[in-house]
Regions:
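N-terminal amphipathic/basic leader segments beginning at the initiator methionine
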Residues: 1-26
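Structured catalytic cores of enzymes that bind and process phosphorylated ligands/cofactors
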Residues: 2, 13, 49, 59, ...
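Solvent-exposed alpha-helices and their adjacent loops that cap or buttress functional pockets
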Residues: 2-4, 51-54, 76, 100-102, ...
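Structural motif
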Residues: 9, 58-61, 81-83, 106-108, ...
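Conserved N-terminal alpha-helix of the aminotransferase class I/II PLP-enzyme fold
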Residues: 19-65, 86-88, 92-93, 98-100
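Glycine-rich loop at the start of a catalytic domain that most often binds anionic cofactors/ligands
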Residues: 71-80, 98
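PLP-dependent aminotransferase-class I/II
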Residues: 104-149
Length: 151
C-alpha cells in the first residue's frame, strides 16, 4: 500500500483503511454479546443511534457494504425486476452477481463519463412503460453510487 501524508484521508475504498490505536482499544473493550438473541448492547446502541440520527423507526447493522447492498436490493425489488445502474457500479462489477443470486434481478447498465450518468441515458434504460405489456422487466430500483470506484 502506498504511503499517504498523515493529513490526507484515503477514500478509495473501505478496504484500505487501518484502525488507529484508539479504534483498536474501543474494539478490544467493547461489551459484546449474541446479536441474534438481542444480547449485544454495542450493536443495539449503534442501531438505535443511527436510527435516531436519521429519524427512522429502527436501524440494522450489517458487517459490509456488499451485504447492505444485498439487503437494499432485496427490499426494493421482486424476482424478475431490473436494477438500473452505472456500467462500472460496485453493485455490478465487484459483488459477484449477488443481486441476481439473492434477488432474482437483472441489470440494465448505463454508460457514464467518469462515473457521471447522463439522465437521458438513464431514462433509456427504463424500458417498461405504458403499452410495453410484459415484454420488459420492471425497473424497480435505480442504483446511484457516490463515489464511483472506476470513474
Amino acid at each position: 500500500m502506498e504511503s499517504k501524508p498523515s493529513h490526507l484521508i484515503d477514500l478509495r475504498s473501505d478496504t484500505v483503511t487501518q484502525p488507529c490505536e484508539g479504534m483498536r482499544d474501543a474494539m478490544r473493550n467493547a461489551e459484546v454479546g449474541d446479536d441474534v438473541n438481542g444480547d449485544d448492547p454495542t450493536v443495539i446502541r449503534l442501531q438505535e443511534k443511527v436510527a435516531e440520527m436519521l429519524g427512522k423507526e429502527a436501524g440494522l447493522f450489517v458487517p459490509s457494504g456488499t451485504m447492505s447492498n444485498a439487503v437494499a436490493v432485496r427490499t426494493h425489488t421482486q424476482p424478475g425486476d431490473e436494477i438500473v445502474a452505472e456500467e462500472y457500479s460496485h453493485l455490478y462489477v465487484y459483488e459477484g452477481g449477488g443481486y441476481a443470486a439473492l434477488s432474482g434481478c437483472s441489470m440494465a447498465l448505463v454508460p457514464s463519463s467518469n462515473g457521471i450518468i447522463d439522465p437521458v441515458e438513464l431514462r433509456k434504460r427504463i424500458r417498461k412503460s405504458k403499452g410495453s405489456r410484459s415484454h420488459y422487466p420492471n425497473a424497480s430500483l435505480i442504483c446511484i453510487e457516490n463515489t464511483s470506484n472506476r470513474g
